[in-house]
């Protein structure tokens, strides 16, 4: 057995013992840190799927611990830019994420696509034998989240959601979870949360999609609509069809 396989086995054993921490950064990154110490031929390889601002940032963090060998996005300009900046132009570029999942040399993928694509890519990645880091919000619906949870259990893959607040900030959130689960504040009767509002505007000007963007695929399972730049890239977050 090579050292990378041994490192992964060690991580999975630790994850099973630590419960919730197994899906948080505090447990996930020690696995990658072990692999990062290996000789270049033994280092893990990963593919970055969705490499806009946040997706590129996640990939940049992961490449300190593993080698980025695939860059995937529906915008070819992003592919070229991130390939050059993070891989020195040596990674393979793809517009079709399924081509990334077909590669046997890739151990895990980072997913930083628009939110409405998360579920499909994450599930297919695990079914293809890949571990997954997926940005928040993970899904648009509770049912999609249940599907991902089901496939995670079925495949036994390592799955981390990029909700950094839960694993950082001095472990305050994990401490709060422990206090609640131990019953130290009694039975929770009510939970109150607040959601900020997004910007408003429109009507927006329609236009032909830029040549560098595969707009029809970008829409995915969402309603088919004409291209307007205010729906795409960073601003997708303000549309319920694509984000929460």
Which residues does each PLM region occupy?
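Beta-strand-loop-alpha-helix segment that lines the small-molecule cofactor/substrate pocket
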Residues: 114, 119-167, 183
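N-terminal secretory signal peptides and thylakoid transit peptides that target proteins
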Residues: 1-20
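Conserved SAM-binding strand-loop segment of SAM-dependent methyltransferases
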Residues: 91-96
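N-terminal Rossmann-like NAD(P) cofactor-binding module of classical short-chain dehydrogenase/reductase
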Residues: 109-110
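N-terminal Rossmann-like dinucleotide-binding module
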Residues: 18-87, 165-168
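Pocket-flanking alpha-helical
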Residues: 56-58, 79-81, 98-99, 119-124, ...
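Predominantly a Rossmann-like dinucleotide-binding segment in NAD(P)-dependent oxidoreductases
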Residues: 50-54, 154-244
């Amino acid at each position: 057995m090579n050292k990378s396989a041994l490192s992964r086995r060690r991580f999975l054993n630790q994850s099973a013992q630590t419960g919730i921490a197994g899906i948080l950064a505090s447990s996930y990154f020690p696995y990658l840190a072990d692999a990062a110490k290996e000789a270049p031929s033994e280092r893990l390889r990963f593919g970055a799927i969705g490499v806009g601002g946040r997706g590129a940032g996640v990939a940049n963090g992961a490449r300190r611990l593993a080698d980025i060998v695939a860059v995937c996005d529906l915008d070819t300009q992003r592919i070229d830019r991130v390939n050059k900046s993070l891989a020195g132009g040596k990674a393979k570029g793809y517009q079709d994420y399924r081509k990334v999942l077909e590669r046997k040399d890739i151990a895990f993928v980072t997913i930083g696509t628009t939110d409405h694509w998360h579920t499909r890519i994450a599930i297919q990645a695990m079914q293809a034998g890949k571990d997954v880091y997926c940005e928040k919000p993970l899904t648009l619906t509770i049912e999609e989240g249940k599907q991902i949870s089901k496939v995670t259990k079925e495949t036994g893959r390592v799955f981390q959601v990029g909700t950094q607040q839960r694993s950082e900030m001095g472990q305050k959130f994990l401490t709060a979870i422990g206090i609640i689960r131990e019953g130290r504040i009694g039975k929770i009767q009510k939970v109150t949360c607040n959601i900020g509002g997004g910007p408003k505007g429109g009507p927006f000007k329609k236009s032909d999609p830029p040549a560098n963007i595969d707009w029809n695929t970008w829409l995915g399972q969402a309603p088919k609509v004409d291209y307007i730049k205010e729906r795409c890239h960073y601003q997708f977050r303000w549309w319920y069809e694509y984000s929460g």
